[in-house]
Amino acid sequence: MRTRSACLTVCLTMTGLLLFGSAFAARDSHLEPYGTAKKNMHPYPRINRVYDVNYNKPQELNALYNFITNVNKVVPGKTVVVLHGAEIRAFAQENYLKYQAIVDKMASLAKRGVEFRMCNNAMHAAGFRARDMDGFITVIPAGFAEIIYLESKGYRYINPVPTPVKDSRCLDNPKASVCKHRS
């Protein structure tokens, strides 16, 4: 009798788990009509790249720092940043204290081999001269011409739009577990 009762309990428990589990699977299946993503964590060949930077605000250089850092982790090759927007004021020595955090980040990239080239035309239009700029900056004749030149030498063009993705999941799903501590 005990054996039969134990068997019945086990059978009911297993049936319940199967039904309960399949209810969850059925409930979530409408959220996965295309299945789930595959991973392809392949290595990249050596690729030289040129970043076309024309930002409205120096603070947007933080996104550039993240772009370059992340790409350089997985893609070998040379990195050149061509600056020709309002962000150039961050590199003026007179503004160092105001933009110290971001300039120090850019200088750390320069120490790791990233080249920073600044458009002479943009620099003059902003009211600066080469002697006003930080020492890791190289002033070049024209930003767009430099980009064209580097592309002709095999560099790949990157336009790093400073749109952050951090916490973007929380915009559509504020109840997601990763969002709870960010409220």
What name fits each language-model region?
Residues 1-10:
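Bacterial N-terminal signal peptides that target proteins for export
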Residues 9-19:
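Bacterial N-terminal signal peptides
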Residues 25-183:
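Secreted/extracellular ectodomain signature
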